[in-house]
């Protein structure tokens, strides 16, 4: 079993009400299928089904004072077709400022991605690349 180099991602959001449905649509498409947290509490999120140390966890914490910034979280997928498919999920789920899917040769020769923001304007990306 390979080790996940990240323990977790803890993204701040201004409002659970704004983003929960978006992440409930997006995260399972990226392999985060086990949900944590609930309607009450300070955080919510999902993990992959692997055991530790391979488990990946993406959480979000409600912080009404949070201000989105230029940081971006990028998710890697296996194929360009997955980028296309997840781009459609993002549109249906209420993603904002969607760019692509498209080739982005300014990053690398085979960089193919969709760039977008969640409903709280946090920057995200889904990318396929082989180098």
Model-derived features with residue positions:
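Short beta-strand micro-motifs in enzyme catalytic cores
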Residues: 42-44, 71, 110-114
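Short glycine-/small-residue motifs
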Residues: 123-126
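N-terminal beta-strand motif that seeds the catalytic metal site of vicinal oxygen chelate
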Residues: 1-20, 73, 130
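Core segments of cupin and vicinal oxygen chelate
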Residues: 10-56
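Long, continuous compositionally biased terminal/linker segments
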Residues: 44-88
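Short glycine-enriched loop/turn motifs at secondary-structure junctions
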Residues: 3-5, 66-69, 108
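Vicinal oxygen chelate
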Residues: 13-19, 75-119
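A short acidic/small-residue loop/turn micro-motif
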Residues: 105-106, 129-131
């Amino acid at each position: 079993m390979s080790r996940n180099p990240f323990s977790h991602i803890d993204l701040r959001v201004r409002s659970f009400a704004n983003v929960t449905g978006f992440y409930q649509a997006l995260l399972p498409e990226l392999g985060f299928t086990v949900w944590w947290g609930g309607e009450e509490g300070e955080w919510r999120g999902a993990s992959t089904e692997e055991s530790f140390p391979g488990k990946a966890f993406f959480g979000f914490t409600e912080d009404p004072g949070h201000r989105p910034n230029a940081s971006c979280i990028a998710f890697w997928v296996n194929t360009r077709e997955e980028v296309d498919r997840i781009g459609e999920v993002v549109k249906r789920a209420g993603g904002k400022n969607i760019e692509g899917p498209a080739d982005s040769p300014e990053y690398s020769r085979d960089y193919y991605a969709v760039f977008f923001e969640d409903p709280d304007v946090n920057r995200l990306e889904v990318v396929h690349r082989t180098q």
